Amino acid sequence: MDADPHVSELFDPTAWRAVDGFGDLTDITYHRAQGQGAVRIAFDRPEVRNAFRPHTVDELYRALDHARMTPDVGCVLLTGNGPSPRDGGWAFCSGGDQRVRGRDGYRYADGVDPAGAGRLHVLEVQRLIRFMPKVVIAVVPGWAAGGGHSLHVVCDLTLASREHARFKQTDADVASFDGGFGSAYLARQVGQKRAREIFFLGRAYDADEAHAMGAVNASVPHADLERVSLQWAAEINAKSPTARRMLKFAFNAADDGFVGQQLFAGEATRLAYMTDEAAEGRDAFLEKRAPDWSRFPHYF
């Protein structure tokens, strides 16, 4: 069976099925893995190196949020379709489409409600990736530049094409800057000096160089990239869902302030609700009696 030309050369149609209810997508594709709880969300504008416009971000957020709320999905693969029909180049995402950038952000097409114009809501996507209780893997087949570079940074893991992946922070070249996860969290990954080099010099790094500095988990032969990403997803999904969720929030907590504390503590509260002790507290309240805590030890 030939790969769907509207997906990607690396896409194996026997391994995936389209997610129901998303047939109207134009700028991304959204598929569910056959036989495991993983989804593939891909930028689908290869002719412009998978640059995003506001409509792209709307679709991306919608698919990611659907994956977040799907109870049997544990892993999200975020990638870019390709290659470009124009020149054969590959891209994960090259950031915001500068052709639609205005003074107040990135502009919707003509005819869209002006109240929605001038957006920088890819930052909302960053927060969704950061805070969703699922493991998000950036699968980078080509260029990850500018805002696309920041998206790979905020993902939990990154796999990259050894032959074609290129990492380049172009923000300062176009008078932009990611003052949040794209820079500060990058410094956590590669160190302050290296992160400043990446932003201030704007050089391109291949997969092996990015792996050596700690920004990439594995440099993978291009032809094997999606197969390996599915294997990683399968290994992740073989672990405890509760442990994975708590681990992600624990890793994030030190950098995320009170928001990180709330997310971790909220999950801990939900775990506490599952205990007999919590059931006793609830039942005593509903039965208008004093709770009997005598069965529950004071652990140390």
Give the predicted meaning of each segment:
Residues 1-83:
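Conserved CoA-thioester-binding segment of acyl-CoA-metabolizing enzymes
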Residues 124-131, 139, 145-199, 213, ...:
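CoA-thioester-processing core
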Residues 87, 160-165, 216-263, 276, ...:
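C-terminal long alpha-helix characteristic of the crotonase
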Residues 116, 139-140:
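Structural motif
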Residues 48, 80-125, 175:
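Glycine- (often His-adjacent) and acidic-residue-rich active-site loop
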Residues 157, 197, 201-203, 209, ...:
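Well-ordered beta-strand positions
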